[in-house]
């Protein structure tokens, strides 16, 4: 490890961080070693990464001292937050600052900050097209990350800003997969109209991040968007039909209807889909499929991801 550049990966047992850890470990000749950062190094997921060869370090992104210790001696750091743990944009911004300040103090030479757009640049709080949430946000889990971009910049942290896309894994873990209606037919529900939604396999986010680290200092200061495909709800339903072997229809609903579904975060996600729909070209433009594949030649299509994961998708 001494002659390899250490990449400290926050959220190493999570969707994005785990993909990066595995990408680094799968490339022993790549010149990098991985430091897997997680709150609890005793979990089965953490132990599995250690068996693959990762260095495990316990740190909590709410605890500045622990993050600085975890970043010390690292060449690079992958910084990510998980809004859905707490539903607090204020906490998310505080965590981003803790990581940025720790990277600065530790002398990290290349940070990747997993971010999203601040939608208020398109839809000001005064704009009534979508409701304002928590008094200060339109899409809280987007806006907090986008607002935090400036923290890395103001501190002079050498950062690449990674714009992610809709996780196809949400069909497994977030209850967004096809559901049976009263007629017994499966329906895939999105409030996207006929507009394409950039999506990606969560594992590929980490692989793309690894591609950024391999390119090195030339990527510092750049904003890089990634996606596996841009697909309409209808196209996704067609793929689900082919792979699952049973008909799945696209159930197009309005953002208003989606916001009213009542599950935790439904209002945030309803606004997110409305932003993606109403500003579709602006949202899709930075998420280049060609650029994503250049970073990650193993980039999966939606159907390829479905074929590998169909048994994991609950069909309610």
Where are these regions (language model features)?
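Cofactor-binding loops of NAD(P)H-dependent oxidoreductases
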Residues: 59
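A hydrophobic C-terminal alpha-helical subdomain
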Residues: 219, 244, 255-316
């Amino acid at each position: 490890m001494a002659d390899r550049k250490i990449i400290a990966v926050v959220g190493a047992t999570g969707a994005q961080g785990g993909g990066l850890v595995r990408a680094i470990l799968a490339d022993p000749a790549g010149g990098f070693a991985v430091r897997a950062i997680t709150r609890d190094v005793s979990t089965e997921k953490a132990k599995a990464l250690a068996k693959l060869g990762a260095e495990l370090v316990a740190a909590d992104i709410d605890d500045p001292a622990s993050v600085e210790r975890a970043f010390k001696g690292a060449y690079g750091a992958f910084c990510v937050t998980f809004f859905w743990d707490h539903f607090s944009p204020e906490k998310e911004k505080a965590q981003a600052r803790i990581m940025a300040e720790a990277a600065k103090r530790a002398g990290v030479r290349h940070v990747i900050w997993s971010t999203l757009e601040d939608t208020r640049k398109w839809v000001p709080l005064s704009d009534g097209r979508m409701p304002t949430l928590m008094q200060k946000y339109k899409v809280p889990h987007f806006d907090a990350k986008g607002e935090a971009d400036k923290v890395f910049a103001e501190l002079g942290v050498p950062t690449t800003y990674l714009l992610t896309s809709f996780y196809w894994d949400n069909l497994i873990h977030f209850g967004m997969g096809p559901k049976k209606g009263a007629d017994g037919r499966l329906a895939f529900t999105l409030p996207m109209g006929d507009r394409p939604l950039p999506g990606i396999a969560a594992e590929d986010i980490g692989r793309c991040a690894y591609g950024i680290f391999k390119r090195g200092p030339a990527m510092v200061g750049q904003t890089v968007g990634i996606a596996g495909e841009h697909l309409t709800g209808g196209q996704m339903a067609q793929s689900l039909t082919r792979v699952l072997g049973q008909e799945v229809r696209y159930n197009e609903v309005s953002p208003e209807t989606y916001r009213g579904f009542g599950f935790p975060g439904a209002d945030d996600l309803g606004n997110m889909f409305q932003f993606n729909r109403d500003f579709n070209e602006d949202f899709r433009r930075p998420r280049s499929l060609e650029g994503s594949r250049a970073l990650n030649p193993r980039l999966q299509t939606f159907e390829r991801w479905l074929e590998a994961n169909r048994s994991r998708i609950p069909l309610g």
